[in-house]
Amino acid sequence: MGLQPLEFSDCYLDSPWFRERIRAHEAELERTNKFIKELIKDGKNLISATKSLSAAQRKFAHSLRDFKFEFIGDAETDDERCIDASLREFSNFLKNLEEQREIMALSVTETLIKPLEKFRKEQLGAVKEEKKKFDKETEKNYSLIDKHLTLSARKKDSHLQEADLQVEQNRQHFYELSLEYVCKLQEIQERKKFEFVEPMLSFFQGMFTFYHQGHELSKDFNHYKMELQINIQNTRNRFEGTRSEVEELMNKIRQNPKDQKRASQFTAEGYLYVQEKRPAPFGSSWVKHYCMYRKTAKKFNMIPFEHRSGGKLGDGEAFFLKECTKRHMDSTDRRFCFDIEAADRPGVPLTVQAFSEEERKQWLEALGGKEALFHTFNRAIVPRPEGGAQLDKMGFTILRKCISAVETRGINDQGLYRVVGVSSKVQRLLSMLMDVKMCNELDLENSADWEVKTVTSALKQYLRSLPEPLMTYELHRDFIVPAKSGSPESRVNAIHFLVHKLPEKNKEMLDILVKHLTNVSSHSKQNLMTVANLGVVFGPTLMRPQEETVAAIMDLKFQNIVVEILIENHEKIFRTSPDTTFAEPTCLSASPPNAPPRQSKRQGQRTKRPVAVYNLCLELEEGDSPSPLKEDPPSSSQDSLSTPSPTTSAAHGPPGLDGNHLAADGGSCGDATATTPSQTRPSMVQWLNMQSPTTPSSNPAGTPPSPRMSPFPLSPAASIVDKLPECVINRKARAVYPCEAEHSSELSFEIGAIFEDVQTSREPGWLEGTLNGKRGLIPQNYVKLL
């Protein structure tokens, strides 16, 4: 579990648990700051100390390996997992370079040191300043409240009103500062991943160019660099979308905090001052408590908490409420007081004081006091305003008209669906489309009056205006679960299953839309709208959450993944029935058991394989590599164009642990454990092929393990090699696990495939065989000899 999201609505409650979450975020940023300072120091050692370069590299590599990113929420995307694991990959590169060290030019100041210093000073330094302001304002706010609440009720009304106004102004200023600080904390937590990894990427690229035999090494690194750049760009794109949503939510809560409160199990909660009576002659004292009341059980909880004493929780007290009575002005010299009586202590009222008259009335209503206010203290989900759009025959007509116009006139327009139209024109077009008579007369395919971006914006606006998102509130959580876990194949199966649980009209409209988006993505070389970019645009549109919270916004990236899966697997999901044996959504989060890892990946003895096998980018066709973006002026920060990127890869999960098989590796971006053969040192190319870490694409995309998982030790006794004959000649074999080829020299196959003429390969851990007339390499532990 990562860091908990900081909800803006909690800024107004300022509960003890909210303060605990803030401290957790602050501690993580301080840890990041210390780490970056240490990393900068290590980088300077590399520049200035050529003679001690080997030691400095080891320290630098160790620092990279030990640091782990924290994340907000309960899961990460595949891109974030690869970014998290990238530091481990960089560490492996450094360790490998130590044995091949050559005299090289160390021009890393501009590419590494300055960006890190800039990030630490401008971003982390800004958070420190915000923290100082926040702590200072907290002290000032609660000191003023303490002082204000001691004012006698017998003072002149004008004096009291002036004091009330001053306190209220101070509280509003405190809330403003709290909102800004919470927003900044979460922004930095999300920003630091790509802001930190990008300078590292530049550093490695620059360093390799200065090696005597860096040409072959750079080929290996370039492939990983390309994948990581895509991961970073995807994460950045999602961050931009998430940031705009967070800012919008923050502004909504700032404008009307009471109406934006989240659903809660408590009818009322907040701070109250409780009068604690002492023996004569000491009188009484007022102690601040955080109080919670559940009306259904009539249970009242209160916990002493003082913001200025380190924020430590005191021993709480709970009792069942008997009654609540408003305290009259002549019975106490304090304002906003009322009495509550516990069921187990009859006749012994407890006097408490609210922060204001309004809060006292709210507490009295919630507790069943005499003065009731028609305003519930209980938090509730804020209903979304419903537009005129409906999922009816007219809605299907609007959808088909817009799609037909887009595919006829603008399928190759750059930034399709990301470049937004003029708001007034979009609203006018949508109004015309929703009028039956005008809709029939409107010809969008041949009309030059309506720009393509106006049509696409109207289509998106129609989908957003539906009373319920196309993928429904009911199934929203179920769609998110498989996007957070499981292998790509299990994700597709889960979403396939859930799509067929949608109401028939929803499924039909979703089918039409996704088919269109599939067509749009097929023209991505012209319009730059890859599947990932379309996911960013349509994720929030098709899967908006019922309750707007920071936690829901953090799930936006997983909504995007769901839409990507729909686009990539349109034919399977909408044209075939789901597997009848597939479990209910409650089981979707469980990952399937892994098959054993490939022997060759664990052993790392690849000297007999061609270099090209481990430099997959050598054989990429020109059209397969992502093209850089041409930036068009964006209409909004969220709709700016982004680098096209591939999405979820193959449908077969990586084999994992099975009985006496080898232990599974740490993950698709994790370590590649190598065993160095006892012979003369191999050439640079051979050595790189032995030690080259597995790139993200070289793993048949499977269940993404946690980046914190350490690889199991390689045990020779557990090797599958011991269970097979030393020499296999002219045998048959059956596949016991599915596999997708990583190179043209390897075979792809499904479970149950029969191989002919199977022989032992020159590479340990691999066999050679023939399948459907094609001969190639087979992972030894994926098959069973017949």
From Swiss-Prot:
UniProt subunit comment: Interacts with PKN3. Interacts with caspase-activated PAK2 proteolytic fragment PAK-2p34; the interaction does not affect ARHGAP10 GTPase activation activity towards RHOA and CDC42. Interacts via its SH3 domain with PTK2/FAK1. Interacts with PTK2B/PYK2; the interaction negatively regulates ARHGAP10 GTPase-activating activity. Interacts with MICAL1 and WDR44; complex formation might transit from GRAF2/ARHGAP10-MICAL1 to GRAF2/ARHGAP10-WDR44 complexes.
Subcellular location: Cytoplasm; Cytoplasm, Perinuclear region; Cell membrane; Endosome membrane
Domain BAR: 7-262
InterPro entries: AH/BAR_dom_sf, BAR_dom, GRAF2_SH3, GRAF_fam, PH-like_dom_sf, PH_domain, PH_GRAF, Rho_GTPase_activation_prot
Residue ranges occupied by any PH domain in the UniProt entry: 265-372
Domain-related comment: The BAR domain is important to associate RAB8A (or RAB8B) and RAB10 to endosomal membrane to promote tubule extension. The BAR domain is also important to recruit WDR44 to endosomal tubules.
Predominant subcellular localization, coarse grouping: cytoplasm
Molecular function in Gene Ontology: GTPase activator activity
Post-translational modification: Phosphorylated on tyrosine residues, probably involving PTK2B/PYK2.
Region (Disordered): 584-609, 622-714
Annotated GO CC locations: cytosol; endosome membrane; perinuclear region of cytoplasm; plasma membrane
Tissue specificity: High levels of expression in brain, testes, liver, heart and kidney.
Polar residues bias locations: 673-701
Functional description taken from the UniProt entry: GTPase-activating protein that catalyzes the conversion of active GTP-bound Rho GTPases to their inactive GDP-bound form, thus suppressing various Rho GTPase-mediated cellular processes. Also converts Cdc42 to an inactive GDP-bound state. Essential for PTKB2 regulation of cytoskeletal organization via Rho family GTPases. Inhibits PAK2 proteolytic fragment PAK-2p34 kinase activity and changes its localization from the nucleus to the perinuclear region. Stabilizes PAK-2p34 thereby increasing stimulation of cell death.
Start-end of Low complexity biased regions: 634-649
A GO BP entry: cytoskeleton organization
Site label Arginine finger, positions: R418
Keyword entries, A-Z: Cell membrane, Cytoplasm, Endosome, GTPase activation, Membrane, Phosphoprotein, SH3 domain
Protein name: Rho GTPase-activating protein 10
Origin superkingdom: Eukaryota
The keyword Membrane belongs to this UniProt entry's keyword annotation: yes
